[in-house]
Amino acid sequence: MPIAEEEKLLPLTQRWPRTSKFLLSGCAATVAELATFPLDLTKTRLQMQGEAALARLGDGAVDSAPYRGMVRTALGIVQEEGFLKLWQGVTPAIYRHVVYSGGRMVTYEHLREVVFGKSEDKHYPLWKSVIGGMMAGVIGQFLANPTDLVKVQMQMEGKRRLEGKPLRFRGVHHAFAKILAEGGIRGLWAGWIPNIQRAALVNMGDLTTYDTVKHYLVLNTPLEDNISTHGLSSLCSGLVASILGTPADVIKSRIMNQPRDKQGRGLLYKSSADCLIQAVQGEGFLSLYKGFLPSWLRMTPWSMVFWLTYEKIREMSGVSPF
C-alpha cells in the first residue's frame, strides 16, 4: 500500500498531531473558563479599585466609590447589575483561550519534545521546563493579546454604567472594530508587554509546575498517571501561577483598561514600569496583590478543570498523556 494511502488510514490525531493538541487544549480551556469566569471578573474589578492614577486624572468616581473586598464585589455585581453580568466579557475570554491555550500548549510540547529533547527515561531538567514554560506563555499571549484587551475592557462596562459613564462597546465585535478604528493594528496590541510578562510568569508557574510535579509523582511515588496525580499536580500549579502572576496581572489590567488618546497612547501610564511605580508609590506594595484571593481561588479550580479535562480528552482521542 502506498505511503499516502497508509497516512489516510491513520487517526486524525496522528495525521495532524499539533492541530489536534491545539484544538483539544482549546476545548479544555473553554470548559475551565466558563466554570471559573465570575472569579476572573471579580478579580479584574478589584484590581481597578482605588487606582491612584485615575484620581490624578480627575475621575471623581474613584473618590466616591467605597473599597470592597472580594465577596462584596461579587455580591455587588449580582445586586447592581444582575447575575448574568458575572459572565460579562466571557465571549472574548473564550476567543482568547482558544488562541492562548492552544498556542502555549503546542509550543511547550514542541519545545519539550523536539527542541530540548526530553530523554527516554522521562527525565526533564527543571531549567528546561522553566524556559519552555516562559517561552510558551510569551508566544501564546502575544497571539491572543487582541482578545485579552477586549475581554478586560468589556469586564469594566458594567461598572461604567453604574458610574453614569457612557458605554464604550455594544458587543464583542463592536469592541474589536472600535479599538481597531481608533488605534489601528497597534491598538489591538495595547498592553502587550505587561501581558506577555505576566504570561511568562504564569506559565512558568502553571506549565512548569504541573509538568514537574506530575512526572516527579509518577517516577518517585506509588502514584500512577491518573486523575489523582493530575489533580495534585494542578493544585500545585494553580498556587504557584497565582503567586508569580498576580503583580503582573494588576499592571496588565490597568494598562489595558486606561483611557487613550487618538494615537492609541495611554493617558495614565507611559509603560508597565511607570504603572508599577505609580501603583507602589500611590497605593503601597500590596496594591500589586489586589485581587490575589479571587485570582488564586480562580486559578486553582481553573487549573484543575483544565488539566483534568485536557488529560481526559487526550486519552479519549488517543493522544498520549501530557
UniProtKB/Swiss-Prot annotation:
Indicate the principal place this protein occupies in or around the cell.
mitochondrion
Q: List the disulfide bonds.
A: none
According to UniProt, the reaction catalysed is: H(+)(in) = H(+)(out); chloride(in) = chloride(out)
Q: Name one GO molecular function term.
A: chloride transmembrane transporter activity
- Membrane-crossing ranges are 22-39, 87-108, 126-143, 194-211, 228-247, 287-310
| InterPro entries reported for this sequence | Mito_Metabolite_Transporter, Mitochondrial_sb/sol_carrier, Mt_carrier_dom_sf
Fetch the SUPFAM superfamilies from UniProt. Mitochondrial carrier
| GO terms of biological process kind | inner ear development; intracellular triglyceride homeostasis; negative regulation of mitochondrial calcium ion concentration; negative regulation of mitochondrial membrane potential; negative regulation of neuron apoptotic process; positive regulation of cell population proliferation; regulation of D-glucose import
Q: Where in the cell is it found?
A: Mitochondrion inner membrane; Cell projection, Neuron projection
Any one of the GO CC terms: apical part of cell
Keyword vocabulary terms for this entry: Cell projection, Membrane, Mitochondrion, Mitochondrion inner membrane, Repeat, Transmembrane, Transmembrane helix, Transport
Record's bilayer topology term: Multi-pass membrane protein
Pfam families annotated for this entry? Answer: Mito_carr
Where would I find the Solcar repeats? Answer: 20-114, 124-216, 225-316
Protein function: Facilitates proton transport across the inner mitochondrial membrane and may dissipate excessive proton gradient associated with oxidative and metabolic stress at neuronal synapses. Regulates glutamate-induced proton conductance in astrocytes, shifting the energy metabolism toward aerobic glycolysis and lactate transfer to neurons for ATP synthesis. Can transport chloride ions with lower efficiency. The transport mechanism remains to be elucidated.
Provide the assembly information.
Answer: Homotetramer.
Q: Which family does it belong to?
A: Belongs to the mitochondrial carrier (TC 2.A.29) family.
Q: Which named protein is this? A: Mitochondrial uncoupling protein 4
Q: In which organism is this protein found?
A: Mus musculus (Mouse)
